[in-house]
């Protein structure tokens, strides 16, 4: 039986992030947009930050923090090569077991990097401890209904082909969960809001390619380990219709 606290295969997540070092620039426009939207929150404060942690930014966050005049920026990632993309001090670190001292940073930014964590409240507690008492956390995760159409198309195709379902897309939180997660982790002024990034693909296969390029392929422990039926993805693509496919990436933004 799978431990209820272990939803994701972290070793597989690490391997996929390591492989994605060579391909992640394929999705640079999406990750740049997500990072910019998250860092826009810094414009709402007059606070000057001096010690920042970029957690899982894949090379798209650390340079933006440095450009804002923050003198000390650490990039941390489960994959050493991905951390090195930040261009500065790089640390290989597991989001579930952070190696940083209490109060080490006055700013922590986690852009689309916490959704493969098994114990999200526990990870947020560790992030709070790594913050100085007056520090700021900015985090974003994909939230529902991100990839809802793709999820439904895959489920319908698999049900048709195999008569049952296997989880093929990571479970995402809802906006209503956000502030509660921060509150449970001990953040005094938790705020959760959402933003939408509109995406358009020529076909469903472009979606699959971008997910792989970003290291975001299925890592759910309960996934079906068998090779998918050859017809699965073409059938799912057909259910999404012909022509361009419009999707929305919903960013659940946590500020604490």
Identify what each model region corresponds to.
Residues 23, 27, 188-256:
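Conserved Class I S-adenosyl-L-methionine
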Residues 1-47:
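Class I SAM-dependent methyltransferase Rossmann-like catalytic core
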Residues 47, 118, 132:
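Short conserved AdoMet
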Residues 112-116:
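Short catalytic micro-motifs in class I SAM-dependent methyltransferases
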Residues 138-202, 217-223:
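Conserved catalytic/acceptor-binding region of the Class I
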Residues 50, 104, 131-135:
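Surface-exposed loop/turn positions
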Residues 121-136:
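A short glycine-rich, Lys/Arg-flanked "PGG" loop and its adjoining helix->strand segment in the class I
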Residues 40-101, 107, 121-125:
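Class I SAM-dependent methyltransferase SAM/SAH-binding core
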